[in-house]
């Protein structure tokens, strides 16, 4: 029986790489994103490679839409085997400009957005006695802070709490919940000079990473694929740092 995986923020970056990785192992992948062109593009790539995928537009701030997407998948396939809660934003905002609205906007997507997708899918997973949930945190949520990103660090630290709480609550029902805390990964977000390191900053950081480079989206996707597999059957409640050794080498 083909496994069914739902991924948020799957149009670009880590989400896109994860969609392709799970499709390559044989999953039917439901690609969701607010970026419709990017989402449909990765679906086409997966299909061209012989995999199964579909696109559904989803803004994770929309509770009703999240419920509808989950219900539609469960109605057609009978289940969702894996949820990868990946959608997120990371905008640089100096503290004096960090209004309640900007704080809430980040939390609404980066933390609450995960709950909106997970919550309606849990009943079916519990009834079947199986399921894997993987949430994307960040090294800024588990290891250190970064100036002008206090809202992002706080939200990603909240993801760690979400993973632990859900793991305990759902473990007795056969549902595993884990997380990944990526380090510096070569995505459009990282290469943005407005909100992150930019190309030159990325090169500088890569030079101090013990493994000698910044990460690629595939480096994270492979860990997500492991956590979603039976190879991780006795692993739950953990957030795995994948940063090329940056935090142990520098902090």
What are these regions (language model features)?
Residues 118, 155, 163:
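Active-site helix of classical SDR
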Residues 80, 94-95, 102-107, 201, ...:
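Substrate-binding pocket helix/loop in short-chain dehydrogenase/reductase
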Residues 224-225, 236-251:
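Short C-terminal tail/terminal secondary-structure segment
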Residues 123, 168-169, 233:
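Alpha-helical segment proximal to the catalytic Tyr-Lys
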Residues 67, 90-104, 147-151, 191, ...:
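Conserved mid-core segment of classical short-chain dehydrogenase/reductases
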């Amino acid at each position: 029986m083909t496994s069914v995986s739902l991924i948020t923020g799957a149009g670009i970056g880590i989400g896109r790489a994860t969609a392709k990785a799970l499709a390559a192992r044989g999953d039917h992948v439901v690609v969701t994103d607010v970026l419709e062109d990017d989402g449909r593009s990765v679906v086409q790539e997966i299909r061209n490679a012989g995999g199964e995928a579909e696109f559904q537009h989803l803004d994770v701030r929309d509770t009703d839409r999240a419920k509808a997407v989950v219900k539609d998948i469960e109605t057609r396939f009978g289940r969702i085997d894996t949820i990868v809660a990946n959608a997120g934003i990371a905008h640089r905002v100096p503290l004096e400009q960090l209004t309640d609205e900007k704080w809430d906007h980040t939390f609404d997507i980066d933390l609450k957005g995960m709950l909106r997708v997970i919550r309606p899918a849990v009943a079916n997973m519990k009834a079947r006695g199986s399921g894997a949930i993987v949430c994307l945190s960040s090294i800024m949520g588990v290891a250190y802070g970064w100036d002008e990103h206090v809202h992002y660090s706080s939200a990603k630290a909240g993801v760690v709490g979400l993973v632990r709480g859900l793991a305990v609550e759902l473990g007795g029902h056969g549902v595993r919940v884990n997380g990944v805390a990526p380090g510096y990964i070569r995505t459009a977000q990282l290469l943005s000079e407005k909100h992150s390191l930019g190309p030159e900053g990325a090169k500088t950081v890569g030079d101090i990473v013990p493994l000698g480079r910044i990460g690629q989206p595939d480096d994270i996707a492979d860990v997500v694929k492991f956590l979603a597999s039976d190879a991780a059957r006795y692993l739950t409640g953990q957030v795995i740092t994948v940063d090329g050794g940056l935090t142990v080498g520098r902090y």
